[in-house]
Regions:
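Cyclophilin-like peptidyl-prolyl cis-trans isomerases
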Residues: 3, 10, 20-229
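Hydrophobic helical h-region of N-terminal Sec-dependent signal peptides
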Residues: 8-12, 16
């Protein structure tokens, strides 16, 4: 199958859209592991952030923490069989301004062992892989389908399997740049407070603000996010 048919045959995975789209930009890298406390109206969540595996993503998140961007935001999207998402809207469901988005690091993070498993933190984005800014989500189940799709060696790629179909002799650049293959960048993991995540996960949802569904009927407030180390 030729490359144009491959791209046409693929469906775009954009279920974790932030509703924002900006040109990509890079942020300074940092090293090591940081720890943050996410204080919510349902309790505290602590998480490790892996700057050694997703440096731009962690630096971006910590800059928002330093700017107190997350203080007073809500978990605006809760799907009990999927994830809980927040970091972009205030308690009145007004979208907060953000800095320019960051370069996607999902493949780098995946190669370093970070996958969308239960309890991990990942960046939300639009259909553009390089559109993540402030919004993040916590996986409440294993979501392997959100992981970046590995690209086999070779150019053209002799054989590539995707969504149950096999494609042959596909130009490598078409696969590397195909938006639907990027997945979502994991950058941290909950180390304590999964019981709080479970409470958020279980909260009743419905329509709210600009959203037709999946909004907690009782707002789940992010009171603050604090860097512990």
């Amino acid at each position: 199958m030729n490359t144009s048919r491959f791209i046409a045959a693929c469906t775009l995975l954009a279920s974790l859209s932030t509703g924002l789209l900006f040109p990509p930009s890079a942020h300074a890298q940092s090293n090591g592991i940081s720890k943050v406390r996410i204080s919510t109206s349902m309790g505290d969540i602590e998480a490790e952030l892996y700057a050694d595996k997703a440096p731009r993503t962690v630096a971006n998140f910590l800059q928002y923490v330093n700017d107190k961007h997350y203080d007073g935001t809500v978990f605006h999207r809760v799907i009990s069989s999927f994830m809980v998402q927040g970091g972009g809207y205030d308690a009145k469901y007004q979208q907060k301004p953000t800095r320019a988005p960051i370069e996607h690091e999902g493949r780098k993070a995946l190669a370093a062992g970070l996958k969308n498993t239960t309890g991990t933190l990942a960046m939300a984005r639009t259909g553009d892989p390089h559109s993540a800014s402030s919004q993040f989500f916590i996986n409440v189940v294993d979501n392997a389908f959100l992981d970046p799709t590995p690209i086999p060696d070779g150019d053209p790629v002799a054989k590539f399997e995707y969504q149950g179909r096999v494609y042959e002799n596909v130009a490598r650049s078409q696969l590397v740049n195909a938006p639907q293959l990027f997945g979502y960048t994991v950058f941290g993991k909950v180390t304590s407070g999964m019981d709080v995540v479970q409470k958020i996960r279980s909260t009743p949802t419905g329509a709210g603000g600009p959203f037709p569904s999946d909004v907690p009927k009782t707002p789940v407030l992010i009171q603050s996010v604090t860097l512990l180390k």
